[in-house]
Amino acid sequence: MIELFTTLNPWLKAIHIVSMTIFISGVLAASFSFKIDLDITENIHIPVWAQREYRWDQIMTTPALFITFASGLIIAIHGQWFSSKWLPAKIAFVLILAGIHGFQAKLLRQIANGINVRKKQATLIILICTISIIVLAIIKP
């Protein structure tokens, strides 16, 4: 089993990084969409972009989140990192990002259905969490 993990570990890491990149890109795109929406006038038909953004979220961002979770969990288990001090901090930042994504998905669904909602932009929080996750994963303090 250890030999299998040793062989698959580089692939798991690659899958983890690619899926994380897709997930973060989707969350940032939604955040930027909310910013654009806040800046434009009410005369523009908003649900069209929201439907497209929501569809993208369903087919790309959400699956990437689950693939990131699964591959990260496998890597952490086989790397025996659950006793390390940096992993809980990384998981906390990941959970914050997952929560932001859930909130964004809800807003996108409501906007796509024509419901007028108040949108919040979370770009700075997303960037801080992403940078923190990357630093913790590389440095492993």
Can you annotate each of these PLM segments?
Residues 1-141:
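Polytopic transmembrane helical bundles with strong interfacial aromatic enrichment
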